[in-house]
Amino acid sequence: KQINHLINEIERSEWVDDKMIGCAAIILTGLSYQNKIRYLDFGLNLLKKIIKFSFDNEGFPKSRNIRQLNFYLKHFVLIREWLKESQNDIPEYINEAIYHLGQAYTLVWQSIKINILFNGNHESNNDDFDNYLSRLGYKFKNENNEIGGYVILKNKKTALVMDVGSNPEKKFSNNYQSGALSFEIISEGKKLICNSGFFQNYSHQLNDISKSTATHSTLTIDNQSSCKLRRLGNKHSRVEQGLKIIKKSIVIEKNYWSIGSAHDGYSKSYGVIHDRQIEFFPEQNKFIGFDKLIKKKNFISTNFEIRFHLEPNIKTMKTQDGKFIFIELENQGWRFSCNNHKIDIETGLYFGKKNTYTENQNIFISGVTQNENQIIKWELTKIT
């Protein structure tokens, strides 16, 4: 009776995560009782529908949500192990889903072992799950450096992560944050540049704040986000007016990395395309960024800021002449500079831990958009 009720509830539920949990329960019921084979068939068919509805062509969640990626991988592995232990055939679509989810998981988590704060993610410890996968013999490899709209370039000491993906469809955008072209830098296992994280409680105003472009390490025009979100009643805010990624390039060589991309999120309202290229020179431990503001026909002049968020434990100091900002990250020292534009430090909010916030600092470049194409060049160099 309870499973029949669950089946009815699944049909009515809007949340795919709820469907996934219910699907697992129905499959377990079908495996546990000999005369309940119809539940197993129903559950496996539902699982196939979830894959078709929720995953893109690369097997990554259409929401682009990394927490959801982990959630799906855990449940697919669990269901596969139940089928194996009960000596039932394992459908190929389950193996394929685990293969693709595992490839993504090893790139966005296992290869760097630090949570990247994009699109609904916050700090969590996946070590127990890693041990669980290892104990069951699941080993994933990924030779690529891009998945789900995220690029991760790395060596033994440094990782550069950037969001080069368009926004998800409206129905998958509950946890989307307007951080197109935002980036994070990991240096010697510590986060040097970060995004501000995600406040998960959607009924709290901090949820909307954490979704804004200003809480990401990227460019903001006129204090507006690159995507317009709309809240319906007391539900999640969703993408109302989105953006498209209109170019992308990735280079990784031994002594030179580069990620380049552009989006049109400010084109309609302000007549500006944001084009960003970040270069890294491993031998010099130097990052050079080029934020290009490309003017379109409907250009409107207004203010802009480019923010570089820092974790709460990081200390900063601006030189008296205002030309440099020094960053102290434990035993590392870094120097930030930007010629021809004002740089400063401001206090913000960090949402890295689930449903909590604390003050942090961010470095920002400020200026006014010009009636011609602009290039804002900035540098971040390790000095100790």
Model-derived features: where do they sit?
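CBM-like, beta-strand-rich accessory domains located in the C-terminal region of large
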Residues: V16, N201-T384
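Alpha-helical packing segments of well-folded alpha/beta enzyme cores
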Residues: Q2, L6, Y72, L101, ...
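Residues that flank catalytic or metal-binding motifs in active/ligand-binding sites
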Residues: G22, G149, G179-L181, T215, ...
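Aromatic-lined, polymer-binding surfaces characteristic
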Residues: K1-I98
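Catalytic micro-motifs at enzyme active sites that drive phosphoryl/nucleotidyl and oxygen chemistry
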Residues: R12, K170-S173, L206
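Carbohydrate-active enzyme catalytic cores, enriched for enzymes
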Residues: F60-C194, F198, Q370
